[in-house]
Swiss-Prot record:
Keywords: Plastid, Ribonucleoprotein, Ribosomal protein. HAMAP family: Ribosomal_bL36. The gene is rpl36. Coiled coil: none annotated. Its main location: plastid. This is Large ribosomal subunit protein bL36c.
Amino acid sequence: MKIRASVRQICDKCRLIRRRGRIRVICYNPRHKQRQG
């Protein structure tokens, strides 16, 4: 999980999701997981 100031979709399978007020990226590729800190 990468924690970044600006999250973005890396591939076309990445999905932006808002959970508990944080923006997350979930993807089938675990390297693409991100969270906005």
